[in-house]
Amino acid sequence: MGDLIFIGSVFCALISAYILLFKKNIVHLFSDRILAFLFLCYSYCTIGYLLISSGWLIYFPFLYRTSAPVNYLIPPLAYLYVKSVLNNKNKWQWVDALHLIPFILIFINYIPLFTMSIENKNAIVKMVIDNYTNNYNIKDGYLTENIQFLRPIQSLIYILLQWRLIYTFEKNNKSEIFQEHTAIVLTWLKKFTIAITFTILTFLIFVIGVIYSLSTKQNINDIVFYSSIPVAISLFYLSSYLIINSNVFLGLPYFDYDKNNIKVEVLDKAKYEAEIEAIENLISHEKPYLKQGFSINE
């Protein structure tokens, strides 16, 4: 069941990524590309899992562990997506490169595996398919596979930062301009973050199960199977939501929210009402329309 949901979620994620990358909304192109890349990373990691669970990885041993570094891109990409939408960011900054450090470190760690001969990879893949516990017992890189437990720590840090962004935005930005559309996008960001939070919680349960199984020397194949189902549902929800609710692709109105809308000059209500009152007084008291030759240009 979990595998079928995963396949559906990958399909929806790829469709969403295609729409995000090739739609003609230039204003929000930056945040759209971040989200598209996030879906592509999710899809690649999911395919990596499906290859192991189905046993098909034996036909593609060169792909073994290639999704491990990519996993460390997902939490920062989700955070940067929310940040870019709420703050109307339209380009990368040098400081954003710091988010790539975990990805780079994990990639370097697995260089010995990536450069290993196909014969040796085949032997490792067979052991992992036979017993998923070997995924943690076999040392594939410079460090032991305990390094994989850094992933839930990274995920927790980023999801807390993600919720903080949303909370700060709601607290500091009370503008009524485009309030309805802002509410739609903000609702999507909350659902997006809730789904990721749900994924992280199930992932933490999975990690606890793995630690218990390793300590008691039990097979963890069943734990992997059951924990994959809520993760699959979460990813399917995220990817299909965008296809059904395409209006969130529009992003937020392009205001400088970092400055609390102080310099935004869009229909200043007080000024607008004063101008309307001045026009009404002019028409009712001076009656310029009675003058011969009067035109609207005056």
Identify the residue ranges that each predicted region occupies:
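Short, hydrophobic transmembrane alpha-helix segments
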Residues: 1, 18-28, 54, 58
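Hydrophobic transmembrane alpha-helical segments in integral membrane proteins
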Residues: 1-13, 148-152
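Alpha-helical transmembrane segments of multi-pass integral membrane proteins
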Residues: 25-44, 142-210, 221-230
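Alpha-helical transmembrane segments and their immediate interhelical/interface regions
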Residues: 52-87, 147-159
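The cytoplasmic-loop to transmembrane-helix boundary for the fourth helix
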Residues: 87-116, 126-127, 182-195
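Membrane-interfacial helical/loop segments at transmembrane boundaries in membrane proteins
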Residues: 122-138
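Membrane-proximal linker segments that couple transmembrane helices to downstream signaling/catalytic modules
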Residues: 240-298
